[in-house]
Amino acid sequence: MGLGEDSLWSISNFMENDALQSLHNASKKVYKPVTQLPPAYWPEDWKVTHYKEYTRFPSVTLPVSDTKAMIAQLTATRSSGRSFSRRGLTLEEIGNLLKYSCGEFTHSDGSVHRAHASAGARYPVEIYAIVRFSSSSDLLPGVYHYNVKEHTLEYLWSDTRTGVDPNTLVADQWALEASVMFVATAVFWRSQNKYADRSYRYICMEAGALIQNAYLYASDTDLQVVGYGGVNDDKVEQLLRLDTRLESVLCAFLVGK
């Protein structure tokens, strides 16, 4: 489907928007030397969870009742898993994870919605899968794009074809043990043509909602999921062959067993 005049204007407008470009580019820095300190060497402030309280004001105690609602159980057991074993995922495991994290659902009345919220239903977030270990002969290691409309993984190329060393994509050695690294990118103009500069917040909100869905789905399976911010954006964008004037890496989540 071709792009309309409004979309072409939005693309041009984003490419010329120095403020948004500068904000996104500044966030690409990964502070590896500091954040990779062993826990024993962490500053004390890193070990403390801070809360905001209005202790001089009256408060109302909120009840928490027992519930058998599935979502309550999933949120209570949600966790970040980092102990990967290089075991490959099945197509069914990947398919279900994507369907219930960011897939599309058609209702009996013909209406369509996705598993995650998106401001104005603009859906600027795209998902790519960098598969390292697979238990299916139908899923070769390499780079894929998730086609939401067809619920398929489109095989783009092997992860060595672009000349990018796969070991340089992440800042942490343990991240290389994950079966799949799912990369969330932003096609900025899709939201900007409706929400202008405010769109950057909405795009980040959408990516967060999507990854939380992945966490919740994994809570009911034997999969391990962890949101991962230590990606080397430039290397990943090179691997995905993105035109970074239009589409850039936001974040990633790792999945394995």
Which residues does each PLM region occupy?
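N-terminal accessory segments that position/regulate proteins before the catalytic core
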Residues: 1-189, 194, 207, 226, ...
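Short pre-catalytic strand/loop immediately N-terminal to key active-site residues, enriched for Gly-Thr
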Residues: 197-206
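Structured binding elements
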Residues: 222
